[in-house]
Amino acid sequence: MVMATTASTAAPTSLSSVTLEVADIEAARRFYTAFGVDTHIHLRASGTQSTGFRGFTLALTVAGPATVDSFVGAAVDAGATVLKPAAKSLWGYSGVVRAPDGTIWKIATSAKKDTGPATREIGEVVLLLGVEDVKATKQVYTDRGLTVAKSFGGKYTEFAAGQSSPVKLALYKRRALAKDLGVPVDGTGSHRIVLGGTADAFTDQDGFVWEAAASPAPTPS
C-alpha cells in the first residue's frame, strides 16, 4: 500500500477538478470531445507506467437508456473498448467502456424505460475511487475539510460537491469497483489521474494524488 504523504495541513473543501494523465494528449482531446465529456475534465501529457486496473472510474448519470446507448455509441465510434455492453440491471440501465488512454467510464441511468428521445445531456459526473479501506480514506478526506454527503458504513462514501466543481467525488471498495466494471482487480503503477483541491498537495494512502487547483472553474481541455 502506498503511504500517505502531505505537503500541508491546509484543507480542501471539495474536489474542484479532475486531470487525466495521458500518453497522447491530442488523441485524448479528440476522443473526449467526440465522447462529449471534454468540459468535465482536464488532460495532461504523461508517460508514467500503469498496468491493469487503475483503481477508479468516471461515471456519467443520464436521463434514460437511449441516452446511455448514445454515449456508449459515441465512445466506441471514437475508439473506446466496451467492457460491459449497455444492459438492464436491478438498478436501471448502464454500460462500461475503456477510453483509448485507459480510463474506464460508466454510463448509467436509474430509468429502465425512456420517457423521451436520446439527448447529449449529462445529469451528473462522479469520480469513484476504489480504495482498500473506505472508512480510513473517508477520515483522511474529512480531516482535510471535505464534507460527507452520503455514507454506507465501510462500503461507500459520497462527498458534497463544490458549487463550481464539474465532478462529484465518491469512495468504494476497490475489489467491488473492479467487479462492477468487469475488470480484474490487479493493477500496478500510476493511477494516471490527479485530483484538484482547494489546498496544498498531498497523496492519500491508496496513492491518489491531490494538488492545489489553479482555478476552480472548469474549462475545456
Residue ranges and their predicted role:
Residues L90-G92, G196-G197:
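Short, small/polar residue-rich loop motifs at catalytic or cofactor-binding pockets
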Residues M1-L83, R98-G153, A161-S221:
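Glyoxalase I/VOC metalloenzyme domain signal
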Residues W91-G95, K155-T157:
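Short beta-strand micro-motifs in enzyme catalytic cores
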